[in-house]
Amino acid sequence: MIKAISTHTKRHIHYLILNNIQDDNELINLLNAVNCKETILVLEDIDCASEAVKSRAKEEETVVEKVTDDKSTLENKILADQLKKVEKVSKLTLSGILNSLDGIFNSEGRIVIMTTNHSEVLDPALIRRGRIDMQIEFSNCDRYQIAKMYENFYGKNADSDILSKIPSDIYSPAHVSGLLLSYRNNPENSLIELTQ
């Protein structure tokens, strides 16, 4: 889908890999170097990209649990101080990411695409409306979607008898697309493969 958007909008695709970024300043400098009117900025698998994007609510629960499980006040204070030091080691922060996306890189017509398999672990501030204008879930394909993919890929309608034997909501769009590509010289075999 990203390639299709790139082709349609005549924009280059730039992948931003947060794991390779040392701190907020480096992120800001990278985004400043990108012409957002000619670019699609992609943060792929953002749930795995950095601890900075994970929900703060879970982090706070973990810290509270660790601190309240100990009985000694002095031990609690030492543990809390150590946890704060560990958190500061990561110089790429959620605040830096949000400010970079909203401020420096904020320009009319920008396209930023984030992909994730686990949106529930992301901090709500990262995916709130206004920051992320559209969320699209790619669930498993029903028969209609498989038929449309087949038609778009091969330029002809799928055999309705074979199509009716394909289980619905089992295969991801990526899986179906891969089969269509694998059987490009024998299209009907792609459908037969999906019936098994």
UniProtKB/Swiss-Prot annotation:
| Single GO MF annotation | ATP hydrolysis activity
| Highest classification ranks of the organism | Viruses, Varidnaviria, Bamfordvirae, Nucleocytoviricota, Megaviricetes
Establish whether keyword Transferase is in the entry.
no
Q: Matching InterPro entries, A to Z? A: ATPase_AAA_core, ATPase_AAA_CS, Mitochondrial_chaperone_BCS1, P-loop_NTPase
Which top-level group of life is the source organism from? Viruses
Keyword RNA-binding attached = no
| N-terminal signal peptide | none
User: Know the name of this protein?
Assistant: Putative AAA family ATPase L572
Q: Could you tell me the keywords of this UniProt record?
A: ATP-binding, Nucleotide-binding
PROSITE patterns named among the record's database cross-references: AAA (PS00674)
Q: Which organism is this entry from?
A: Acanthamoeba polyphaga mimivirus (APMV)
Binding-site positions, ATP? 32-39
Family to which this protein belongs: Belongs to the AAA ATPase family.
